[in-house]
Amino acid sequence: MDNRTLLNWSSILKNEKKKYYFINIINHLFFERQKKMIFPPKGKVFNAFVHTQLYDIKVVILGQDPYYKINQAHGLAFSVENIVKFIPSSLKNIQKEIISDLGQNRSFSHGCLTKWALQGVFLLNSVLTVEAGKPGSHYKLGWERFTNKVISIINEYCKGVVFLLWGSYAQKKICLIDRTRHYILLAPHPSPLSAYRGFFGCRHFSKTNKILKQQNKSPINWFF
């Protein structure tokens, strides 16, 4: 059997999705969507897994939960739909750091990170859904059990992945990552509250590409 068949998300998460806690999450969302607005839309909750297969992962960026305003969240951490004109502050700060880090006089016309995902950047939120207007509303739904399992799978089946852990919440996942197999870069969260405490100047984008090149992997084109 082709190794890519063995290492695709569909096959490797098949048993996890049969577990009671996961079925309970899906059922809960089904009933919540009958009376509430939930983000991302139903068909986009698992976009991170659609755009970046397990065998393609070079980089993992961990977020918390999705954006809670309409037409923003589409299943990729920190990313917004390319039709969105207002770029969230954290993403705007990420863009600023990319420009500063890479020393290129370029600008961004949108905030959609799909091109990152297609290059092997796995954009995973720890919690995959949120109720409109209520940040953190699905923290107790059980998503973290699932996404912790996903991180553990990446840790086990991949090698030389660069984990970008921004902020204390993401950095709690360090215990799931084997530092002898992977690389971990730490920085404060890019939100306006903490970006000036060390996210700006962290140079994670150039550092990541340097690590990838050392492994004979193609670097990421961070401009989108």
From Swiss-Prot:
Gene Ontology CC entries for this record: cytoplasm
PROSITE patterns registered for this protein in UniProt: U_DNA_GLYCOSYLASE
Function of the protein: Excises uracil residues from the DNA which can arise as a result of misincorporation of dUMP residues by DNA polymerase or due to deamination of cytosine.
Gene name per UniProt: ung
Keyword field: Cytoplasm, DNA damage, DNA repair, Hydrolase
Record's protein name: Uracil-DNA glycosylase
Entry-linked NCBIfam families: PRK05254.1-1, PRK05254.1-2, PRK05254.1-5, ung
Catalysed reaction equations from the record: Hydrolyzes single-stranded DNA or mismatched double-stranded DNA and polynucleotides, releasing free uracil
Top EC category: hydrolase
Molecular function (Gene Ontology), one example: uracil DNA N-glycosylase activity
Compartments where found: Cytoplasm
